[in-house]
Regions:
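Compact, glycine-rich, soluble single-domain proteins
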Residues: 28-155
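Bacterial N-terminal signal peptides
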Residues: 11-22
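N-terminal twin-arginine translocation
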Residues: 6, 21-24
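Bacterial N-terminal signal peptides that target proteins for export
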Residues: 2-13
């Protein structure tokens, strides 16, 4: 009798997890590409990125991730220049947010954002993209405002 209750509880938990997974957009569904950073300080760096293409992917972003590998990130791209605003809700790792102009020029970097913060982080100018990297990665790569990002989206 007790074994049956344990099995029933386990089955219920599995079904609950499966049902919840339907509502979470898996990150592997996002397009993955490589972009090139041209830094004045350290030259070129290749970065593997996931590119958000829909409002749902942008809303999900890097939420609930517990690790961000070096030289990888997520690129939030918008077709028209705007003051991009971001936050760290449900994001467990510190990030560097690199705001990029239409021509691929790095406009501004917000380094070491605070995990789980709902403070709004602004590009503070007309930009078309935000590249999120692991916290400290922009400094390790020597990335600064004025450096260039090379990817077909910025052509």
């Amino acid at each position: 009798m007790q074994a049956r209750a344990v099995r029933r509880t386990a089955l219920f938990a599995i079904l609950l997890l499966l049902a919840a997974s339907v509502f979470i957009q898996p990150s592997f569904a996002m397009r993955r590409e490589t972009l090139k950073l041209h830094t004045a300080a350290q030259g070129e760096h290749l970065i593997n990125v996931e590119i958000t293409e829909t409002d749902e992917e942008r809303a999900q972003g890097l939420m609930f991730r517990t690790h961000m590998p070096e030289k990888s990130g997520m690129l939030f791209f918008y077709k028209t220049p705007r003051d991009i605003t971001m936050w760290m809700r449900n994001t467990y790792v510190p990030l560097d947010m690199v705001f990029i102009r239409k021509d691929g020029t790095v406009h501004r970097i917000e380094a070491g954002t605070e995990p789980l913060s709902e403070t709004i982080i602004s590009s503070q100018g007309a930009t078309v993209a935000c590249l999120e990297l692991a916290g400290g990665e922009a400094a390790r790569l020597g990335l600064k405002p004025g450096d260039k990002v090379d990817h077909p989206l910025f052509k």
